[in-house]
Amino acid sequence: MKGCRVAKTGELPPGIRRLSRRAFVRGSLGALALLLPLPWRPKPAASQEIQQGFSRPYRAAFQKVMTSRMVQCLLCPRNCETKDGERGECGVRENRKGIYYSLVYGNPCAVYVDPVEKKPFFHVLPGSRSFSIATAGCNLHCKFCQNWEISQATPEKTDNFDLPPEKVVAGAKAAGCLSVAYTYVEPIIFYEYMTAVGRLTKGAGLLSTCHSAGYINPEPLEELAQVLDAATIDLKAFDPHFYKELVDGKLEPVLNTLKTLRRRGVHLEVVNLVIPQFNDQPQNISDMCAWIRDELGPLTPLHFSRFYPLYKMQNHFPTPVSTLESARELALKAGLKYVYLGNIPGHQAENTHCHGCGKLLIARQGYQVGEMHLKEGACEYCGVKIPGIWKQKA
């Protein structure tokens, strides 16, 4: 296979164990999320609610049929070329007799109701809940991944829900959510599922949102933008070497994704996980903030998030709060107006202040929202429009 490593059926990377739902909750920093008690469980005679390795093969989008049953995937920058029976780098897309299939369509391994602030979205319907889904797999291999137990797994090794797109929308409505979020792993790898759900949200009064690393090719991104209302994108570092060594990817496609989403009018927030000694250099942070200001605009929300030792970086140390505060000062100095600190519950930098008059607009304590001073998307004090989505979708 050219362009990426071969993933054999059911194979896990060395040192990875099979995921249980309990382990996922325990291992995630988002342990406050609640596993949704699905109100529309199918009858046992028809199917089981959860099955290990459940799969619904679905013909993949963006594939190029080559000679001798070779298929090239055109979804992400890896552009994997696979022989019959092989999978791409993500571990969830497989060549079957010259046709590429997604193995995770309609079978997520994680279904949660989260505060929208957990994504994180600080400028999208504050205080609301988001119906959050993820499948096994990822097209990146971050050494610091917090959800590695599912992102680095194949669908054979996870317990999966039978949850087609229409049931996602029904579940979100039943749970009182105002949005659906494709999150926890890289949602690009369940592209067909994500876009199908996104199309259904349009007539259901739900926002379609994602938290992504932005590792996607231009053509599928243009189509995805049609069904997305908001996106949080991880800009893991402003350094190609960091992406190569710690992410197993490239920086340039992520920058292109950010610019495309801005151009297409998708609400955009950016997250940078600050890892001591790896991407916390002041000049690197200043350069990143200047790029965000110039290419995405000074009103783009930026979240500096605290690193905790996980996965292959468990011997490293958490980010000092002072490092995050210094990064925020650099961002403000560069001209960014909405700069937040994450994974530090109770810090004043969780709050939103008006870029016009500086007064408090939204008070937060972790994922909890307190006082709000917005009126129809504008500052209650000075009337300046605040970037974001503040009104429930009709």
Name each region found by the language model:
Residues 162-322, 330:
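Conserved AdoMet/S-adenosylmethionine-binding subsite of the radical SAM
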Residues 102-183, 188, 194-195:
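Extended interfacial segments that mediate partner engagement and assembly in macromolecular machines
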Residues 16-23, 33-52:
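N-terminal twin-arginine translocation
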Residues 1-19:
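N-terminal secretory signal peptides
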Residues 83-86, 153-154, 364-366, 389-392:
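Short Cys/His-rich "knuckle" micro-motifs
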Residues 367-374:
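Short linker/helix segments within small regulatory modules
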Residues 73, 142, 354-357, 379-382:
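Short cysteine-rich clusters marking metal-coordination/redox-active sites
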Residues 17, 47-72, 78-134, 149, ...:
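N-terminal [4Fe-4S]-dependent radical SAM core
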